[in-house]
UniProtKB/Swiss-Prot annotation:
It comes from the Bacteria. One of its GO terms (biological process) is protoporphyrinogen IX biosynthetic process from glutamate. Its EC number is 1.2.1.70. This is Glutamyl-tRNA reductase. Pfam families: GlutR_dimer, GlutR_N, Shikimate_DH. NADP(+) binds at residues 186-191. The lineage of its organism: Bacteria, Pseudomonadati, Campylobacterota, Epsilonproteobacteria, Campylobacterales. One of its GO terms (molecular function) is NADP binding. InterPro entries: 4pyrrol_synth_GluRdtase, 4pyrrol_synth_GluRdtase_dimer, 4pyrrol_synth_GluRdtase_N, GluRdtase_CS, GluRdtase_dimer_dom_sf, GluRdtase_N_sf, NAD(P)-bd_dom_sf, Shikm_DH/Glu-tRNA_Rdtase. Keywords: NADP, Oxidoreductase, Porphyrin biosynthesis. It comes from Campylobacter jejuni subsp. jejuni serotype O:23/36 (strain 81-176). Disulfide bonds: none annotated. The record marks 97 as: Important for activity. The gene is hemA. Substrate binds at residues 49-52, 107, 112-114, 118. The active site is at 50 (nucleophile).
Amino acid sequence: MYYCISFTHKNTDIALREKLSFSNEAKKSEFLKIISTHENIEECLVISTCNRVEIVAFVKMACAEFIVKSLALLCDVDKDILLEKADIFEDSGAIHHLFSVASSLDSLVVGETQIAGQLKDAFAFAVKNNFCGVHLSRAVHSAFKCAAKVRNETQISKNSISVASVAVAKAKELADLTQKKAVVIGAGEMGELAAKHLIAAGAKVIILNRDLQKAKDLCERLGVLSEYDSLENLKKYLNQYEFFFSATNAPNAIITNSLVEELSYKRYFFDIAVPRDIDINENENISVFAVDDLEIVVQKNLALREQEARMAYGIIGRETSEFFRYLNDLALMPIIKAIRLQAKEYADKQLEIALKKGYLKKSDKEEARKLIHQVFKAFLHTPTVNLKHLQGKMQSDTVINAMRYVFDLQNNLEGLNQYKCEFDMENNDEIY
């Protein structure tokens, strides 16, 4: 069954989320290797962003305690606290949650489109490292289809905002950014988003990054209203400008009290990183806004999107039902075919026995074959119709398993791929 363990801004604070975050691929790989050794876990992937850690898996049976214990040990967090905080979803609930995440209905900023790229990256990493197979591939691709349908059929992503844009919006409330210089620390996706929103607000940006070439490349994309420098010169910039937006993947705070001097003018620090980049004392001239603080601004946008969100949840509900209907269809049709094939084989076998024993003339063989086939087709007609009527219904799994047992079909369904995937595992590409 599908399984999901979720830690988000809804059930954990930023201090706990930053401990759980997977800031590098090595840590993510280590965790997935650990949990994939469990006998009940067949496939798994991890989505890790500033606002969430999602463990998505395909399992034989529930194993939340093992997964959470593994996460707690790796991240040095109390297991009982994690179990208490975790939202756990099973099967249809897990798929509905995954579709909601992909469609940005579960985001801090409803309608932001960043999560689709983050899910794609998480999926690609899991596929590349052999943690993800056909089960999760089918689910993730269906999640992408659902997200596209939500975007196309609602206005949920119109004028969409991210945490970075919320930070810039908050800065605009504090001062006119026109012609001001703002320092963006980090040249990754979140840093780039912040820089773009700042430029759109009329500000000029200075990109600071450990990798100078990456900062230069970002400035080339941003255009003439940007410049760049090495993160080594951070202290100089911290004590020269007013607005700072920090979005690095550093494991520890990079802006500390030792770097920030007392100045006569106000400075505003926006920490949009998880783990947090900024650990300084606030005073009358220094204000710090972390990810959770920005939720206040986010709330102002939620009312505007409430109606669209209701429409989107309707789509997600229908797509979740359709997903399981499709899986049931994939399972039922080969069983119907296998039963008919089994009946045909038995009929042909008995016909040959009758011919050998002289119960039937060779000249009557074809007519007898037609008659026998018509009989078993007529006999199987009602069971076939009833099986088809089960498609998409809750009891279908029970009936499918019963039919496999009764007709001894366990080893006769090699052609059945219940979780048919639309992802080329060799080339990491879609094969629609």
